[in-house]
């Protein structure tokens, strides 16, 4: 469906939301936009914060794919860190650490895989 390469920079999070919205609406999949925007921005934010290396040329990949059954889409974010994503337990006073909880709440399923040169974190949205 769509594949993008983003700089490992916090300014890319807002761009991510705009691109996800535009891509899904263009393809008539606007009903996925609210959840897909949030999931993509959370996964890109995690990649920027936790996979940041000393190499400013490091890139983050974002892919949106429609499922073979055409009833679901996948949001996939790749980064250069081989470390697994960690879902933190938070309290109402916590100011950070809710990203993967949000992804879990908004998706039908999420997970991650090792990729050459890093990992891919994905979330599947079904309507």
Spans of model-derived segments:
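Conserved ATP-binding N-box helix of the HATPase_c
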Residues: 31-55
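Conserved beta-strand-loop-beta-strand hairpin that lines the nucleotide-binding pocket
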Residues: 1-3, 48-127
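Bergerat-fold GHKL ATPase/HATPase_c domain
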Residues: 1-38
């Amino acid at each position: 469906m769509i594949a993008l390469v983003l700089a490992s920079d916090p300014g890319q999070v807002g761009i991510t939301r705009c691109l996800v919205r535009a891509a899904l609406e263009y393809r008539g999949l606007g009903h996925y936009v609210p959840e897909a925007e949030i999931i993509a921005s959370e996964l890109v934010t995690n990649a920027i914060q936790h996979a940041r290396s000393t190499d400013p040329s490091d890139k983050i990949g974002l892919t949106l794919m429609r499922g073979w059954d055409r009833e679901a889409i996948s949001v996939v974010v790749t980064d250069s860190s081989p470390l697994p994503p960690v879902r933190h337990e938070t309290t109402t006073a916590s100011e950070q650490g809710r990203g993967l909880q949000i992804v879990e709440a908004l998706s039908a399923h999420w997970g991650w895989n090792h990729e050459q040169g890093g990992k891919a974190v994905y979330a599947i949205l079904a309507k």
